Amino acid sequence: MKRILLLIILLITTAQTIHSQTVVLDANGVTVKWTGTTVPTPYFVQANPRGTGMEWFAIVDNSTKSNITDYARNIQSGIIYFTRPSTTTPIPFNNIVTTLVTNMIGLFGPAGTFNQPIGSWDVSNVTIMVNFFSTSSNTSNFNQNIGSWNVSNVTDMSGMFYQAISFNQNISSWNVSNVTNMSSMFSGATAFNQNISSWNVSRVTDMTNVFAYATAFNQPIGSWNVSNVKFMWGFFCNATAFNQPIGAWNVSNVITMPFMFREATSFNQPIGSWNVSNVKNMSDMFANATAFNQPIGAWNVSNVTIMTGMFSSVQLSTANYDDLLIGWSTISPNETPLKPNVTFSGGNSKYCNGASARASIISNYGWTITDGGLDCSSLDTETFETNSFKLYPNPAVSVLNIKTDNNFINQPYSIIDGLGRVVLNGKLNEVESTINVEQLSKGIYYLKVSGNSASKFIKE
């Protein structure tokens, strides 16, 4: 009798276990999930989770996920792996149940032409989505709705949509709060332009090339919390449409910014308040970013050692370039001096009031600076006159007269040569002052009085 009771209990328990291991529909009304903890044998299950009638599903785990890749590349593989016995039609991709999969590295990478609906997949246990849709062939056709995916356990999305040139679906509701790596996530995803401004990226440390060559992307991500990001190498490189305000970003932990805005030809937003004090590399940061023209003289660049090509082919306004030179040359008591022997490219930018600051950086720190040179061409070679003072005679032979108002008495002046060197300086002691310029060589010079623009005069 006891044996019979035990057998009955065993049969009931087995039946309950089998019944509990089935395919169900998630509360979101889209995702299909496997309630079991192991893959059944065989791994085909019949269920009615969608309420539309009985369907066949294939349950996969990490050991069989490669079959999905083969299926995506070649329909014949689908016949081999995803066709039930005595049938000829493989199970559709939307009926592959991925609840037991935790790693989806490169799942569709080799399948450049894949474009099947997989929005019902359960990815809630996946932690790695590296190169998920990435394709080196740049022929990715995938553009299906995957907005309902639960990616809350994913930590690595690097290269997920790399060169997924067709993808442009709404994924704004994704919970990416556990992601730490987004490097190259949308790099080369030339169609993508969805609003992902609400994403919580506070744990991300690597955003290298995240939107590089994402030529359509132009969404407001200025509210992103990037305070833990260390790597912004190539962040918007060649993101030719992007021009959104990101001046409020906390970039205080970033150490690399090379190529960040390289060829981002639309970008021209104020970022002068950024704390870049930990950045070491700014090479090509704004190279060919031809629209950019903002003051960044307040940046603390004392840790930067590489600035080659920083503004290559870019021309800041003279005012903004002067601001840069003057700001960077001015070291506050609590600031670290500039790194020595840095090679800096100011592109085609020209300086005027920043001449002495430029000369100071070169002489004090051994920097090599290339730019558009000294240019105060808005000033003519006749008598220079403003509301405050005038110069005469111009050209001058031995003396240069300055007539000014009381506001300029005891103010310092500098005379700068065409190479940006201060060759003479002093103070204006009277309303009408005379400067002896007899010892100066013939050429064009610039007189700068404190608080005023430089004024050009010719020494004959």
Placement of each model-derived feature along the sequence:
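Residue-level signal for beta-strand positions within conserved beta-sheet cores that form or flank
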Residues: 16, 41, 338-340, 365, ...
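C-terminal outer-membrane/trafficking sorting elements
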Residues: 384-460
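Alpha-helix initiation and N-capping motif
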Residues: 3, 354-355, 394
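Short small/polar-residue motifs
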Residues: 18, 27-29, 55, 324, ...
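Bacterial Sec-dependent N-terminal signal peptides
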Residues: 1-22, 381, 449, 460
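Negatively charged
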Residues: 21-378
